[in-house]
């Protein structure tokens, strides 16, 4: 899991640092954000100290109604050595008791001009993306008609050459050779290129080429949600390959399953066209049109009625 700190939030969202500078590199370990409303009332029994604390106009309005002693007590309990940071929304002024407690415990206090709802949404999305579990898969990721297609297979089977052909046909390259995959939600896998390999494609006999330089900015993407896996393998005459498309294999990455198709490779087969059509057919299936199922139903009707013509 990647490491995220309050300093990353400062750089990403241009927050203002009000206090607790010595704690800006304290790790944030969860994407959950807490609004300490009940804690302002003095109830800290279930206080989630390891979360970012988001304070808005409601919390500060209640805090102003307390005595100075109560303010100091609540802010001292709010700022623990485990708290990764406190964020104030709407450009609100930080109470002096909060500043003092934060400096004492090294809790970064940040301020933003965004509303509380906007701030919560943006920070949560950022943390979910950065803290998502990550794995690397050997393959190529291409955006084909809006479908993120992960092309896998053994070394030398033709993954990069197929990707190059797809780029020439107007599709967009995301990553070649190594694809970093993050599970951002239970059913969402997003692929990224390693920074070192971004926009690069390796073609045996040709070397490394820069796809963006050769084909333009429209030929690449920085990331893409993965929906389909196309596995390339050398043609095995002893193996029975699916010819109807009724069966659907799955590939599991983390807790998410995606559709997987196996494409046998041998001379004369245009893999780019096959994968392109597979992506279009996958989109049709998601819209409710299944050619294989329709053919199967027609065949069943013919058999049942004893007809001899299709």
Swiss-Prot record:
ATP binds at residues 153-160. Residues 201-210 are annotated as: Important for the catalytic mechanism of both phosphorylation and dephosphorylation. Its EC number is 2.7.11.-, 2.7.4.-. CDD domains: HprK_C (cd01918). InterPro entries: HPr(Ser)_kin/Pase (IPR003755), Hpr_kin/Pase_C (IPR011104), Hpr_kin/Pase_Hpr_N (IPR011126), P-loop_NTPase (IPR027417), Ser_kin/Pase_Hpr-like_N_sf (IPR028979). Pfam families: Hpr_kinase_C (PF07475), Hpr_kinase_N (PF02603). SUPFAM superfamilies: HprK N-terminal domain-like, PEP carboxykinase-like. The keyword Nucleotide-binding applies. Mg(2+) binds at residues 160, 202. GO terms for biological process: regulation of carbohydrate metabolic process. The active site is at residues 138, 159, 177, 243. Residues 264-269 are annotated as: Important for the catalytic mechanism of dephosphorylation. GO terms for molecular function: ATP binding; magnesium ion binding; phosphorelay sensor kinase activity; protein serine/threonine kinase activity; protein serine/threonine/tyrosine kinase activity. Keywords: ATP-binding, Carbohydrate metabolism, Kinase, Magnesium, Metal-binding, Multifunctional enzyme, Nucleotide-binding, Serine/threonine-protein kinase, Transferase. The keyword Nucleotide-binding applies. It comes from the Bacteria. Catalyzes the ATP- as well as the pyrophosphate-dependent phosphorylation of a specific serine residue in HPr, a phosphocarrier protein of the phosphoenolpyruvate-dependent sugar phosphotransferase system (PTS). HprK/P also catalyzes the pyrophosphate-producing, inorganic phosphate-dependent dephosphorylation (phosphorolysis) of seryl-phosphorylated HPr (P-Ser-HPr). The Walker A ATP-binding motif also binds Pi and PPi. Homohexamer. Belongs to the HPrK/P family. Both phosphorylation and phosphorolysis are carried out by the same active site and suggest a common mechanism for both reactions. This is HPr kinase/phosphorylase. The gene is hprK.
